[in-house]
Amino acid sequence: MGQVLSKDNEDEANLNVTQKQFTKDKVLEYFNIQNHLQFRPVEIRAITSKLGIKNIKEKSDVTLNDLIYLLKIIKDEDIEGIDHNIKHVLNILSNSFTVIGNFPFLQSETTPKLSIESLMKSALFHTGRYKRLLTAEYDYLKLVFISLSGINKTYLEEKTSSSPSSSDDKEDTLYNLDVMGFSSEDEDSILSRKIKWNTFNVIQSFDDIDLDSIYVGAYDLLKLLTFFLILSSVPEMSHTQMQDHLSKSIARWSEFETYCLSIIRYINLDINVKNIKSTKISYEEFKRGISNGFPLFFSNAWMKIFKNGILSSISTTDVANSNNAPGSHGDANDNEVPKVHKKTPNFVESKLINDASISVISMCLKNMKSNLSITTQNLIKLYAGSESGFSIRSLESKIFKWQAPTLLLVSGKRVKNKTMKHNNRYIQFNEMYPSYFRSSESPKKDWQDDNDKMTYAVIINSPWKNSNKNNFGDEDTVILNLSPRFDFYKSVHNPVLNGKSIYFNNLGMGLGFGNSQPINKNTVKKFLPGDISLTIEANLEFAIFRHISSPNSNGASFFQKSKQNEISVQDFEDRFMISDLEVWGIGSTKELEEQRKQWAWEEKQAEARQSVNLRGLGEERAFLEMVGLVGNHSANGGSM
């Protein structure tokens, strides 16, 4: 659309940079012009048509009901009975978008209502288009933290009380902007293109906000992450199916929230059910936790809100009518319509696998940029101890014929002192498992609770086999901690170990991930646990996860230690009595790709309908009118 200078032109213009002064209102006007031009006409049309307006300046505010309609998260008829959790999240989103709407003057007092201008500016950042105006190095995560914080409440009140005249002075302040190839004859739309926004000191300093003085409420972040986890559980398929899937997942909010409580403990290990409403998360905790734990999940969720919702040409009417789309009946007249394929067998969830747990596991795989995809449509239950019995032979008979990746999950309650002292099978297991901690020190940490229920998962890419002598596996194996806290342990890249971190021993030594081959000779039976390892004894009754960060350990290192700030430097163990053990086969993603094509086709058809309306007006003029750059009697289109 010509909204940015080419590289050659920019290099030439850099030789002629002029510093000019502008008022705050003028700076905002120039930035807003450039913001609008980062969007396609069909995207602007998607917003205006859903809200029943001709241009984005026609409507002064966006209500929560408007936001629901734009996001397409529930059906129109369900708006009156909206879930209280969704209402909470909508308020968080609305407040966040309102703060970003002040950009670059983030310390400005915001209006109590969300505007379309703020929504558009939020779309600029959450879809990554800010890189066109700023740079790829701009700290997006810092902006998100500021937008989620209480900056417009506590922080601004303190600022105002300490310097009561500061806000008035700011309105009259002149700001220096670097302008490339400045000409006094430039119209606003042309001048806005010549400004070097990335050098503007207010943008570079985030308007001088003191990050140590603001925070994000842990409870609000829990609700937001739960919403994100629910969104990520919905695969791209026909929009009718997506909305139905989303509605069902929202109805099971508590299941997703339980996992998100584990996830938020990756940000702050001390958070629990009792203190979450009073806990505040600092910027350092926020940045470190999200950057190390789930950066793609966080940014992709924001992206999805705009891509599949606010900027999508699909309206709720389109969703309601999508069952009548040609693609649903295999219309032979349109060769681009996805073909209808037979449905995969109905997925039946288990004690350990449901939409919520799948969503967390998928989040991990995507963050690690794994080629594997896990959904309800490609998981096949191979073994469940509660159904087939907790027997190593039964486990072997169920999983060894599967020649594709598998997902193992094991769950149970922490072993208590009574069991340690009086359960003979545990005592025997403990004697075979070398102790790392001195008898005088407790291996249990303050953040571990006697009543914890632990769930670990392991992604295994190699086919299972008896490995009573040599380990098997590859460097794509990963151990996941799903509860009571979230964590992940990727394989170490080592040309000697070569990812051979797994054994399946049916001669009395069970299963091991991250261990060396156990010793099993004559009367000597001994496990050789690695620094980061999960050991399941042969009766499938007890398991131990070990995490040793100390450099003086003698154990093998098949897996990387935790990157969670507090955990990374700690030595600890999770010893638990197994209540559930399951293995699932990970099948083909062909069906997923077919459904994604159906989603893409519906989006394309909706955009085509919008484009017809735009061409009727003349696309360029229609776009300028929608963003409010020209009126009915103006022909100013210089920015194009």
From Swiss-Prot:
InterPro entries: TLDc_dom (IPR006571)
Residue stretches making up the TLDc domain: 351-587
Keywords: Cytoplasm
One of the Pfam families matching this protein, by short name: TLD
Location of the protein in the cell: Cytoplasm
PROSITE patterns per UniProt: TLDC
Family according to the record: Belongs to the RTC5 family.
Protein name (database record): Restriction of telomere capping protein 5
Source species: Debaryomyces hansenii (strain ATCC 36239 / CBS 767 / BCRC 21394 / JCM 1990 / NBRC 0083 / IGC 2968) (Yeast)
Gene of this entry: RTC5
